[in-house]
């Protein structure tokens, strides 16, 4: 018999997104971070092999607003250099994602119409994939350029609930170890999946939330801790009888911020199979 409790811990089952472009309107910081690495994406794109078509993917794209200007500029650069190859862009996220706003954005029906590259440029095709990025999403050897920003800190499932906080940064040692192990497995799966998808000479550029050498992370860079504030308010709801103990615990974020060592671990000798000779390296 299936474990009903375990099912509720699966990220694809429990996460949802508010619509109408809510995400992009409230994540200017993510857009600023994405815009800052435009040059890296340009170099990656201009180094791609001369395939018949170019297939790009934006993994964990949300409503597409934070990366829209980046993709617009990349396509504009290609076209300005006389590269008129067909371009497919696959946006991936959970099935509950705000794909409606995403498709409207790219056609100029919503948001920044001057960046609606699907309408502005010829021979550009936009698709969506409503499956999480912890598994292979595209046919092997078909992806020219993969990109992901501020998304892959999400784990595929919560290995446990956190009893006295809302986020792993405030969890006890046992809970942290379980999340760390889950995140390690997920990170290897992510890299192996992208390696299978990439065509020869393909590139994958990924920008993630993490914990730096000083222990800083999103919402904890000096002053108040964002997640401690979240927990304080959520705990107050429990103390006041507004929510139950179960509801408090179930609010555990399905996230883990990796350290540099955790990001680099799959590339160590002990996990060298990440880069199989028959597959392109990530």
Language-model regions, residue ranges each:
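N-terminal charged/capping segments associated with class I S-adenosyl-L-methionine
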Residues: 1-139, 154-171, 206-214
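Short catalytic micro-motifs in class I SAM-dependent methyltransferases
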Residues: 150-151
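Short glycine-centered segments of the SAM/dcSAM-binding site in methyltransferase folds
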Residues: 203
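Short alpha-helix
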Residues: 256-270
